[in-house]
Amino acid sequence: MSTDAGPPATINGTENLPTKQWTRVLEALFSESVLAKVWHVASKAIGSTTPPTLYPEYTGSDKSTYIYRTLDFWTSGFFPGSLYLLLERNTLLRERHATPHSTQANLRPHPLQHEHLCRWWTANLHQNALRKDTHDLGFMIAPWAIKAWTLHRDPAAYNTLILAAHSLASRFNESTQCIRSWDECITKRYAYKDPSQDYLVIIDNMLNLDILFWVARETNCRRLYDIAKAHAITTQKHHIRDDYATFHVVNLDPDTGEVKDKFTNQGYSDSSCWARGQAWGILGFMQTYEWTKERGFLCTARALADVFLDRLPDDGVPYWDFDAPVTDTEPRDTSAAMIAACGMLLLYKAYKGLRDREIADHYLHAAMRLVDCTVKGYLNPPVRFEAGPASVVSVYADQHSTHQTERQNLVEALKVVGDEHAAETILTGATINNYEFAPRRWSNHGLIYADYYFLLFGNMLLEMGLVDSLMHR
């Protein structure tokens, strides 16, 4: 635990958590800057006559400005998912009467305009639900479509979820008892090009099971439930080593289900422990436990979390791979930290429900420390909202002339202000891929899913009643 923790704060009457740590984390999670950064990017689409087809992924060479990907790329759902998380947050704060002091500013987008941008940014994503050439439909659809349904009962989003789940299920193979991840995989070291010979499954795919479980419950479809559970069991069997570190990729024989190879595509080596892969495993197995309540999945998630925590450096932010040589320039991965933190919050929730407060509190402390250490080292400088001047427009008048008039009864325009070179992402220090044989290497940048899971962590704290407990201590 960090030495600047300060005196303990009592949460829900039992957890004793460092006050300074909680305060720093909550100020970052619920700051005006968080909303302003997302709004700055989202509002660029307000004046367009057509919905977006390009979606933010990572920051470029300037470490500040987003590089965009096409709507069919696997990360397309995270930015609109972030918009929906912030829209949901307004409801959670209101319902729980939790008002962190950093969110009290009146300058914020109107909820209806916020809702419009949520729908606008997702208008072109519904078509992805029909794709059967990718395992990433959970990432591409669930972050925004589940919120669109739960918040607004959006029937289009509901239909998209159902279509996406069945499209994803079409990639399940009875012989392998899992969902195919990649049809092909090509690096400077190897090339898998024939799906009839190779059945590639990655640890990341655990996060795509949630959409199957969700639709299975909504539509009473046992087949979707069974497919999701079978995939989790197969991943337990093949992706997890005896020491509970994880393999990234497992190649199975598509006819027999026998293991042909185990290797990495984004880690340091085939035998190393890629940090984000370990994090995907923690959160994925916890989501599976939440749906099935089978203790084996909980135990697996806990074991993976313990490896993650045991291998953290002293400053609490994971290197991109736990087995990569440690140097002054070795990249970190803040996305791995945020994904793992969300998984550990679910561990807290699970063990609290099982009435094991000691274990529950351990993982709550661990999750908070992960976020706190990330905030201390990798939170980008803040931006803020500022009201623009009274709006003046040109109005057509007789004799082909115009005159100026102030708009009446309208909220002043909001603009986002900050340092001239302020980053568009909330966090920096992420690493997409630093594998030496990768076609391209990315490290030390902002990343949309690092920010998404940072925002999700805040909403999870609200849902668990932890934020208002601290605010009213």
Language-model segments: which ranges?
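Well-ordered alpha-helical segments within folded domains of soluble proteins
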Residues: 2-11, 72-87, 133-150, 199-217, ...
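Acidic/His metal-coordination segments adjacent to aromatic residues that form catalytic metal sites
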Residues: 60-66, 118-130, 182-195, 260-269, ...
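CBM-like carbohydrate-recognition segments
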Residues: 26-30, 34-61, 68-73, 96, ...
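The feature captures the catalytic groove of carbohydrate-active enzymes
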Residues: 169-221, 225, 248-280, 284, ...
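Long, well-ordered core segments of solenoidal/helical folds
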Residues: 31-50, 104-132, 161-193, 228-261, ...
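Structural helix-adjacent loops and short alpha-helical linkers that scaffold large soluble proteins
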Residues: 17-31, 86-115, 149-162, 216-229, ...
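Long, repeat-rich segments with strong aromatic
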Residues: 114, 119, 271-317, 325-333, ...
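Low-complexity, Ser/Thr/Pro/Gly-enriched N-terminal "stalk/linker" regions
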Residues: 1-76, 81, 85-89, 100-101, ...
